[in-house]
């Protein structure tokens, strides 16, 4: 084992291995008429073309590569649903340039996963892996050793002339001694970084920074911080060893330093993981695997070639498709909007629902079924909506329910009509960790009690017998007895927990009994530590509400701790 391989293995032992996240749900065809899916395909295809043109012509795009790639995958699915061929890899890059490349830029086809990598590598030999440097693709043209052209990639056939910027980029040799009479190189202009770790820092907008400096009319001081990574030498030496050695002699050291021979897909996996974690002088977004054998430059076209492939890192942003929109009423009478999405895996967690807050916020986001959103995991693994990246062309109108009559003191009972959602939310809170913490009792169980009309108010479950509980389909006698005993033990829960379970707006510990709490005046509450005038009013409104007092009276008859009548 050579020293370099040993270094890699040791590095991996002390580093986190890449977790492949962001898996899309199993691709299925949308339940749309043929006419609509044709419209949606056309709209998405046009948008992707606009973003692609911005990327290749201007060096930046309104969306990240992660988002672009995932939406391109979605386009492929939709096209396959209509029996259309996959044109995403062979489609020419949109846009025009003025200056002809001596050899076309081929671009890279992206491998989906390790299985695709293994399949592509099978039967190929003399393979090498390099970091996929995230920068601005260019052509360097030398005549007699002198740099005569620096061209942007453009559409792969023609690009912009940036030659006047070359003297300000010290990483580009202006003259190469003993160079071939005609030398054409293709590579990446990148922002020089100091120990950049892709896994920790991501892309940091490096490519757009370089593109902006190159497109300015006057030379930017930033050009002094630009490096170059040569990844193609059309019609150059036949072996990679000779190629990288000569490039180093000519003044392009990065190619030699970051090109490694690979024998199997496991070698590629190892280097990909290493470069994802390791401090590097540039931003990367994956690796490129290439074979030594290439066609002559005259055969290169502005479409992905078959002699090199990209395998990108797991996406930092994850796209989900909105399947449906649900409106829920919380225990305090506040409505929230929950997006149901096609299942997506982020890290080790499958995401199916995303709470986005109030109806007002939903309207501001302007989200409809079929839209594509980006998600991330916030604290405790809770999914968070980050952005809407694609809106379907045909938008179905959805009307939110009217919740004006609901508030913090409504729906302590199942009736009147319309109360069931808030009533159910109250029950879920009551049995949850913020209330009485009754193990194994959640929304599904309470929903069954409501459905079978076995409960009509927030504490009516205390009257249920084991036989009544067992009458619910799916609950046998043994489980019914266990639930009954849990309910009876709940009577001994501390008084403060019962207050919380009922919805008391508590911000301080309340250890007194119900009768004592009830007799406190507004001013007494307001002067207690941690309670101001506003919260004191909320507490008094809660304590004086007829429904709350009726619940307290019932709990007194059940001899619940803290609610017993005192002489």
UniProtKB/Swiss-Prot annotation:
Keyword annotations: DNA damage, DNA repair, DNA replication, Ligase, NAD
Top-level taxon: Bacteria
Enzyme active site: 132
Disulphide bond pairs: none
Single GO MF descriptor: DNA ligase (NAD+) activity
GO biological process: DNA repair; DNA replication
EC number annotated for this UniProt entry: 6.5.1.2
Function: Catalyzes the formation of phosphodiester linkages between 5'-phosphoryl and 3'-hydroxyl groups in double-stranded DNA using NAD as a coenzyme and as the energy source for the reaction.
Listed NCBIfam families: PRK08097.1
The name this protein goes by in its record: DNA ligase B
